[in-house]
């Protein structure tokens, strides 16, 4: 983030605009809308700026800039085409810690003006940091179309009743749930239709209803990595959560979608580190839910595929806590799609089997004859550490050493890496694979080179000379 978006109260503050042509006029108008005291320095005033001066909405200080005019100024905008003057103004403002914007020169700006969607008191500001003004304009048009013109009236009425609601509901959670319920009710529609009296009646009626503080636990599948693969329902739940317990595999892009004031707790497990136990995770879920919180358990992929999600909602059920499950795109499905490897194919595979590498030990996973069937694609979650063992078992039970394999690291993300090789050479390949990774075994991997569409790095391009049987790459 190159710029921190903040909203500044300019009411009655002295600001200085240097230049009073068309560009300067646009900045003056914005500053006047923010109720700032606008002072102008310009050799000439355009006709519309002259009207503002006549109506005493601005103050014309001088035709020429002087350092004395920076005294007691909160913010400066320079809208001139004088490069030397702009450089001088920028330097002197920085020396005085005065906010300055040199129009159309973002390297000489301590702040920039965003594109504004005004539904006062509701304000939406967006910016591309000066990199893509046309894209910014298109986004503004889309947002303008989404937000009704009278949406500001909704905020105004809510503001007038805010203190009364605070007195009526002393508990913060009660207040938040009241407002959430109200804004999802016909209250908003009444205001947008101009029926403010009916809207107030709805508000009063909701005030007299009991607010339930019953907590709940929601399992949410975050998908395989790309934040665009999070479901719409998953996004809605993250925006409503009070507490989010998340795995370390969940990407930062998805974590950024969580409601800003929600409590976030990482409960992920990592090899070689001291980890929170599953029992401790369950205790945390129940603890927060029993306090009336909406608790989200955010898990990579899908919560019911090797995710112990069932154990967590069993505990919720036993504790009498309401729960729900929001499925996610499981890693095998998402990553295979992003690497151009169809898990089933009429020519290569009649089915697919999912297993986890953590349980590949004799006595627990003992159906190797089925797993070795070449007519099935085998997908191994968390298989890096046991990859050599798995390959040996599959070969022992009849799978060809030339069976193609793909190891995918950080699948569906911009850091996705793909290693393609043969089952018999996995011992040479696996050192180049980071953990965690997904292992796909089967003839469908033949299609990777042809069908790969998402840009990723093929690690073996760098080390291909070490292998003898990579003819299918």
Curated annotation (Swiss-Prot):
Pfam families: CysG_dimeriser (PF10414), NAD_binding_7 (PF13241), TP_methylase (PF00590). One of its GO terms (biological process) is cobalamin biosynthetic process. The modification Phosphoserine is found at residue 128. One of its GO terms (molecular function) is NAD binding. Pathway: Cofactor biosynthesis; adenosylcobalamin biosynthesis; precorrin-2 from uroporphyrinogen III: step 1/1; Cofactor biosynthesis; adenosylcobalamin biosynthesis; sirohydrochlorin from precorrin-2: step 1/1; Porphyrin-containing compound metabolism; siroheme biosynthesis; precorrin-2 from uroporphyrinogen III: step 1/1; Porphyrin-containing compound metabolism; siroheme biosynthesis; siroheme from sirohydrochlorin: step 1/1. S-adenosyl-L-methionine binds at residues 224, 300-302, 305, 382, 411. NAD(+) binds at residues 22-23, 43-44. InterPro entries: 4pyrrol_Mease (IPR000878), 4pyrrol_Methylase_sf (IPR035996), 4pyrrole_Mease_sub1 (IPR014777), 4pyrrole_Mease_sub2 (IPR014776), CobA/CysG_C (IPR006366), NAD(P)-bd_dom_sf (IPR036291), Siro_Cobalamin_biosynth (IPR050161), Sirohaem_synt_dimer_dom_sf (IPR037115). Its EC number is 2.1.1.107, 1.3.1.76, 4.99.1.4. The active site is at 247 (proton acceptor), 269 (proton donor). Keywords: Cobalamin biosynthesis, Lyase, Methyltransferase, Multifunctional enzyme, NAD, Oxidoreductase, Phosphoprotein, Porphyrin biosynthesis, S-adenosyl-L-methionine, Transferase. Then it catalyzes the NAD-dependent ring dehydrogenation of precorrin-2 to yield sirohydrochlorin. Finally, it catalyzes the ferrochelation of sirohydrochlorin to yield siroheme. In the N-terminal section; belongs to the precorrin-2 dehydrogenase / sirohydrochlorin ferrochelatase family. This is Siroheme synthase. The lineage of its organism: Bacteria, Pseudomonadati, Pseudomonadota, Gammaproteobacteria, Enterobacterales.
